[in-house]
Amino acid sequence: MFLLHEYDIFWAFLIISSVIPILAFLISGVLAPISEGPEKLSSYESGIEPMGDAWLQFRIRYYMFALVFVVFDVETVFLYPWAMSFDVLGVSVFIEALIFVLIPIVGSVYAWRKGALEWS
């Protein structure tokens, strides 16, 4: 039977951990001095006078590498619990994990063959 009072500590933690950052933002907004001007609107470059525009446009190639990294990073996060309980799980779960690993590998090989990962 599902009883909510069994999770009192969880709800208290959730409420407190939500209220503290909200209060911190509100208090800093009230106490912070409001000063606007050209210095506040310029970009900070370690004390050096900024040269040129602060907004750089990255090439799309960088985003492809970042996307591949994120895909394999998320895959690692999902495979970790499976690896920790590998001895308890059966062969069918092993086959599912193998398919789960093969799909991004096939996608990476496809992207590599198409030249999406070439930096030049």
Swiss-Prot record:
Catalytic activity: a plastoquinone + NADH + (n+1) H(+)(in) = a plastoquinol + NAD(+) + n H(+)(out); a plastoquinone + NADPH + (n+1) H(+)(in) = a plastoquinol + NADP(+) + n H(+)(out)
Domain of life: Eukaryota
Main location: plastid
InterPro entries: NAD(P)H_OxRDtase_bac/plastid, NADH_UbQ/plastoQ_OxRdtase_su3, NDAH_ubi_oxred_su3_sf
EC numbers: 7.1.1.-
Entries under Pfam families matching the protein: Oxidored_q4
Transmembrane domains' residue ranges: 9-29, 64-84, 88-108
UniProt membrane topology term: Multi-pass membrane protein
Top EC class for this record: translocase
GO molecular function: NADH dehydrogenase (ubiquinone) activity; quinone binding
GO biological process terms on file: photosynthesis, light reaction
Localization in the cell: Plastid, Chloroplast thylakoid membrane
Keywords in alphabetical order: Chloroplast, Membrane, NAD, NADP, Plastid, Plastoquinone, Quinone, Thylakoid, Translocase, Transmembrane, Transmembrane helix, Transport
One Gene Ontology cellular component annotation held by this UniProt entry: NADH dehydrogenase complex
Subunit structure: NDH is composed of at least 16 different subunits, 5 of which are encoded in the nucleus.
Function: NDH shuttles electrons from NAD(P)H:plastoquinone, via FMN and iron-sulfur (Fe-S) centers, to quinones in the photosynthetic chain and possibly in a chloroplast respiratory chain. The immediate electron acceptor for the enzyme in this species is believed to be plastoquinone. Couples the redox reaction to proton translocation, and thus conserves the redox energy in a proton gradient.
UniProt similarity note: Belongs to the complex I subunit 3 family.
PANTHER family reported in the protein's UniProt record: NADH-UBIQUINONE OXIDOREDUCTASE CHAIN 3
Protein name stated in the entry: NAD(P)H-quinone oxidoreductase subunit 3, chloroplastic
Name of the gene this protein is made from: ndhC
